[in-house]
């Protein structure tokens, strides 16, 4: 079976690796173009999928768009049986969707139709969802609206971070995709339309959302911290030894106590919220590495959180 793989971030890599490992012929990998990196943006960084594909000697394509006739002709010339799409980052026009003999299949990190869109892992945790999952669907022209081929649910534990959920769903996605490809080869892959009720959209995370609002209930603050960990990272300003610094908050738990929002309630970094309190467990100063709260506080006095 001739496969075109389309993906960009680290989340996609285990699925690409599994497809290769199970003997499928990956004739090309499509990924986002290299991005400027470094302080001056003079270096170009290739995506994780780009790096992995080159390790296996797979031709890599990095178009900025797939809307043009030239890009669509190149894609069609690959004569793919199927395209596998996992966090690629570009919408696929009809000409691309129709080119593979068996269609295009997407690995999506939510229980559709909940959390269609760009940031399903973060949004599920930030909303306080108790469960999410991984789904394989056949793509159509809508945004994550196609019929579902396979799904697996995953519980979201109370202190689970987006990073932890990301890694788990990525591995589940690899297993589901291999099963889906096998069923597709056997012509036994059954498709079920998505429910019409319960549709929500997982908008891309806005930078402004990363700043913690201590006037919100502790539950919401805690969900924001873990839902934005490790990237982009929730943050706040702290008065440390008399100077105000910006600090990233990577882990937290629900705490006990009350007070004006932002009040430091004890020497274990329990912070009062609009309702209840949150205990900060892992913090990161600018230019530093993430530290457990006890180590972060060594020789430091936090008097105020803004």
Swiss-Prot record:
Keywords: Protein biosynthesis, Transferase. It catalyses: L-methionyl-tRNA(fMet) + (6R)-10-formyltetrahydrofolate = N-formyl-L-methionyl-tRNA(fMet) + (6S)-5,6,7,8-tetrahydrofolate + H(+). It comes from the Bacteria. (6S)-5,6,7,8-tetrahydrofolate binds at residues 110-113. Signal peptide: none annotated. Its EC number is 2.1.2.9. Transmembrane segments: none annotated. It is an enzyme of class 2 (transferase). One of its GO terms (cellular component) is cytosol. The keyword Repeat does not apply. One of its GO terms (molecular function) is methionyl-tRNA formyltransferase activity. Disulfide bonds: none annotated. NCBIfam families: fmt. Attaches a formyl group to the free amino group of methionyl-tRNA(fMet). The formyl group appears to play a dual role in the initiator identity of N-formylmethionyl-tRNA by promoting its recognition by IF2 and preventing the misappropriation of this tRNA by the elongation apparatus. Belongs to the Fmt family. This is Methionyl-tRNA formyltransferase. The lineage of its organism: Bacteria, Pseudomonadati, Pseudomonadota, Alphaproteobacteria, Hyphomicrobiales.
